[in-house]
């Protein structure tokens, strides 16, 4: 059932200045193009203000400089995009698990469950688990031995949390993710791979969100650590012993090899690959499809991906790259020949001056000058 909130209540909740009918009931947040009666939309960029003329929304979130272009009720704020996010949170009617425990779940008798915990169908909770207040665990999740889950954390369906993992407060883990599986640790002996026991765990801070089908491996000896406020997209691989600093964002498909240390407030673009045993300092942005092979010690933006181009142009570029060493050798040969030529010209010039008797005359005038 849709949530209904009056415009005046929305204004009070987000600290907006209201213009128009305060009693309008808002049920949905929509784009300017698709908004209908009862919907609220937002104008983030003044370039799109002309779209307000045909907008059917009941209200618009916008900044003061765009108010005169709005023909319906408005909520005026300094940051329309941030205000839209707050309104969307208030109007979010996504189905959530209630504070009850389904009888089909299997919960070990010595596990500890806090107040208002919700457990969905076919959840398995093994021994020694500590689940704090207001935690919700959707259907099909498996929680291994001695796991700790902090207040208000939400696990969507079919999440697997291996033994000993610690998850902080108010985290969200989307469906299909696996936390605490063995890291890829082996030693080769006489041509045979021998498995190295992964004795560490995974430690996740507070307010962390992990997307669907992401895997975070447990440490070999020390823990794999995810800092507070980290956001990780879908289908990422975080290998053993990795440490990710607080408020770092990692887009979909990123692969982080073992023992990487990533600083605070970094942004890792989609499908990037980070080599093992390196360090990335705070406030580094790595653009999509990049391959990071060595440590980064200075904050900034780094890239190595190849942008798309027409196939014929790409084939020419690839062919040129294959010839780069021979081209470099030719350039060096040409430089050597040019330098040799100028040397011969200069020596010849002075020889001619000496033979013609002009050199003493030139020297005399230079000295007089």
From Swiss-Prot:
Pfam families: Hexapep, LpxD. InterPro entries: Hexapep (IPR001451), Hexapep_transf_CS (IPR018357), LpxD (IPR007691), Trimer_LpxA-like_sf (IPR011004), UDP_GlcNAc_AcTrfase_non-rep (IPR020573). It catalyses: a UDP-3-O-[(3R)-3-hydroxyacyl]-alpha-D-glucosamine + a (3R)-hydroxyacyl-[ACP] = a UDP-2-N,3-O-bis[(3R)-3-hydroxyacyl]-alpha-D-glucosamine + holo-[ACP] + H(+); UDP-3-O-[(3R)-3-hydroxytetradecanoyl]-alpha-D-glucosamine + (3R)-hydroxytetradecanoyl-[ACP] = UDP-2-N,3-O-bis[(3R)-3-hydroxytetradecanoyl]-alpha-D-glucosamine + holo-[ACP] + H(+). CDD domains: LbH_LpxD. One of its GO terms (biological process) is lipid A biosynthetic process. The keyword Nucleotide-binding does not apply. GO terms for cellular component: membrane. Belongs to the transferase hexapeptide repeat family. LpxD subfamily. Its EC number is 2.3.1.191. HAMAP family: LpxD. Keywords: Acyltransferase, Lipid A biosynthesis, Lipid biosynthesis, Lipid metabolism, Repeat, Transferase. The active site is at 240 (proton acceptor). Pathway: Glycolipid biosynthesis; lipid IV(A) biosynthesis; lipid IV(A) from (3R)-3-hydroxytetradecanoyl-[acyl-carrier-protein] and UDP-N-acetyl-alpha-D-glucosamine: step 3/6. Catalyzes the N-acylation of UDP-3-O-(hydroxytetradecanoyl)glucosamine using 3-hydroxytetradecanoyl-ACP as the acyl donor. Is involved in the biosynthesis of lipid A, a phosphorylated glycolipid that anchors the lipopolysaccharide to the outer membrane of the cell. Homotrimer. This is UDP-3-O-(3-hydroxymyristoyl)glucosamine N-acyltransferase. The keyword Lipid biosynthesis applies. One of its GO terms (molecular function) is N-acyltransferase activity.
């Amino acid at each position: 059932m849709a949530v209904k909130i009056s415009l005046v209540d929305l204004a009070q909740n987000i600290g907006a200045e209201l213009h128009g009918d305060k009693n309008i009931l808002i049920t949905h947040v929509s784009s300017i193009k698709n908004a209908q009666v009862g919907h609220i939309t937002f104008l983030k960029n003044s370039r799109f203000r002309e779209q307000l003329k045909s907008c059917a929304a009941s209200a618009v979130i916008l900044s003061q400089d765009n108010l005169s272009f709005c023909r319906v009720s408005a909520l005026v704020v300094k940051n329309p995009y941030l205000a839209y996010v707050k309104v969307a949170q208030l109007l979010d009617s996504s189905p959530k698990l209630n504070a009850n425990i389904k009888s089909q779940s299997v919960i070990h008798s010595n596990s500890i469950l806090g107040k208002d915990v919700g457990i969905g169908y076919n959840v398995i909770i093994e021994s020694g688990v500590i689940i704090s207040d207001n935690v919700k665990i959707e259907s099909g999740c498996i929680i291994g031995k001695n796991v700790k889950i902090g207040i208000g954390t939400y696990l969507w369906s079919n999440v697997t949390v291996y033994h000993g993992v610690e998850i902080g407060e108010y985290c969200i883990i989307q469906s299909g993710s696996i936390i605490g599986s063995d890291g890829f640790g082996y030693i080769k002996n006489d041509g045979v791979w021998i498995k190295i026991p992964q004795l560490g765990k995974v430690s996740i801070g507070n307010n962390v969100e992990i997307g669907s089908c992401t895997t975070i491996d447990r440490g070999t000896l020390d823990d794999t650590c995810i800092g507070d406020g980290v956001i990780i997209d879908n289908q990422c691989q975080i290998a053993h012993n990795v440490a990710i600093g607080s408020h770092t964002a990692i887009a979909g498909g990123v692969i982080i090899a073992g023992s990487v240390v990533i600083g605070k407030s970094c942004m890792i673009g989609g499908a990037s690959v980070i080599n093992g045993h390196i360090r990335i300092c705070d406030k580094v942005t790595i653009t999509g499809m990049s391959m990071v092979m060595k440590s980064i010690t200075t904050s900034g933006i780094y890239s190595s991906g190849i942008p798309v181009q027409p196939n014929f142009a790409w084939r020419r570029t690839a062919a040129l790259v294959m010839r780069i060493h021979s081209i470099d050798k030719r350039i060096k040969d040409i430089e050597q020949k040019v330098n040799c030529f100028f040397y011969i010209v200069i020596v010849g010039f002075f020889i001619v001056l000496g033979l013609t008797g002009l050199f003493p005359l030139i020297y005399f005038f230079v000295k007089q000058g």
